[in-house]
């Protein structure tokens, strides 16, 4: 007997909606300068690529939770960066953080079927909400005040039904830093798992890099990746750490799902986590680029404040919504940016600009803005 119900049709992928902007930006000599997607383009460290090449013949299944070398390297990096005390047994690998974000709600709901709601920032990475949708769950936005989650705005009934609260600090797309200590305390008080996506932590400008794990492990997870830190987005390697019971459960269920980072990638990524020098070089690049574009955009009376963290400028212009501002930038400078609507209705009057193009391309964008 056929089931009767409403079938799921995936929406258009957000960045597929930018083709018109790319066409407008193509009229410039030198072509468009695509700052719409936060994919690093700078070269990774040579020693990481050399290690990957050495392991290319490996064919065996790697441990789903990650090799001990990989987990130890990730733990040692966290301990250096955040003054923590983790071992490789306290965390596990994931196939890049997007995969983890998209699958977490479904896995947690199997364990806590009475909870059916995912809470996430009103302006945020679209996959937080999509992960809830793919699991057949409710997704509820949490308002932001000065870039931070306004926990007092969450309806009591949604708190009772909440499976997880997502946080992202530094934020994609706003670049804001959140009160991680306050989030951890709120989650413990209400019995809601708080998952802090910290993949931009290395690019924190307003303070030292911070992790929610500095405020204890119980009831929280932190999520990290080498995609942004080490310019290795295509490697698809990250890890999660925190609440021992949750980490243990996820290790088991993810193993059943067959989720694993290829062994040669883990070996190369372990070397990336062990080295901080290449990250300092990248920090310098992004800081210079953010300063360059933040200043150049003033020529069009675009407000593009230097972020507290991340490699994004969250921009606005009085009288224009995000699509209109994106159109203006494409027409006047050949820049392709992401309208803020892609990150939630609360972002309608903004655009996100990712400074991930090489220096010469961003200098060209700045020159076009100066001449406009």
Residue ranges and their predicted role:
Residues 266, 270, 286-294, 304-316, ...:
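Conserved glycine-rich beta-strand-loop-beta hairpin in the small C-terminal domain of fold type I
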Residues 145-206:
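Active-site phosphate-binding strand-loop segment of PLP-dependent enzymes
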Residues 76, 328-337, 343-372:
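PLP-dependent enzyme catalytic core of the Aspartate aminotransferase-like
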Residues 2-99, 272-273:
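N-terminal small-domain helix-loop-helix segment of the aminotransferase-like
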Residues 116, 189-193, 218:
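A short helix->loop->beta-strand "cap" motif at the edges of active sites that frequently abuts
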Residues 106-167:
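PLP-dependent aminotransferase-like
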Residues 216-287, 372:
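Conserved core segment of the aminotransferase class I/II
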């Amino acid at each position: 007997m056929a089931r009767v119900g409403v079938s799921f049709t995936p929406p258009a992928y957000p960045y597929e909606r930018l083709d018109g902007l790319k066409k407008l930006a193509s009229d410039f000599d030198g072509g468009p300068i695509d700052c719409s997607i936060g994919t690093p383009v700078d070269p990774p460290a040579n020693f990481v690529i050399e290690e990957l090449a050495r392991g290319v013949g490996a064919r065996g299944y790697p441990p789903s939770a990650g090799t001990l070398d990989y987990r130890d390297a990730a733990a040692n990096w966290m301990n250096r960066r955040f003054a923590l005390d983790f071992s490789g047994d306290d965390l596990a690998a994931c196939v890049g953080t997007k995969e983890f974000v998209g699958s977490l709600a479904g896995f947690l709901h199997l364990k806590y079927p009475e909870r059916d709601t995912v809470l996430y920032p009103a302006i945020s990475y679209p996959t937080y909400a999509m992960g809830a949708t793919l699991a057949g769950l409710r997704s509820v936005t949490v308002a932001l005040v000065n870039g931070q989650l306004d926990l007092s705005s969450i309806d009591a009934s949604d708190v009772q039904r909440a499976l997880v609260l997502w946080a992202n600090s530094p934020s994609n797309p706003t670049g804001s830093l959140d009160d991680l200590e306050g989030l951890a305390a709120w989650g413990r008080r209400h019995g809601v798992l708080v998952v802090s996506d910290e993949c931009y932590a290395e690019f924190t400008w307003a303070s030292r890099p911070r992790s929610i794990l500095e405020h204890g492990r119980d009831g929280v997870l932190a999520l990290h990746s080498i995609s942004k830190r080490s310019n290795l987005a295509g490697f698809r390697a990250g890890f999660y750490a925190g609440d021992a019971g949750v980490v243990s459960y996820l290790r088991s269920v993810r193993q059943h799902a067959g989720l694993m980072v290829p062994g040669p990638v883990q070996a190369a990524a372990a070397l990336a986590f062990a080295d901080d020098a290449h990250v300092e070089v990248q920090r310098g690049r992004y800081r210079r680029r953010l300063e360059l574009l933040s200043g150049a955009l003033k020529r069009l009376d675009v407000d593009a404040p230097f972020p507290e963290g991340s490699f994004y400028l969250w921009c606005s212009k009085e009288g224009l919504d995000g699509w209109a501002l994106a159109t203006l930038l494409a027409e006047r400078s050949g820049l392709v940016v992401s309208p803020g609507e892609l990150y939630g209705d609360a972002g309608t009057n903004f655009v996100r600009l990712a400074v991930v193009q090489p220096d010469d391309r961003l200098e060209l964008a700045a020159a076009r803005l100066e001449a406009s």
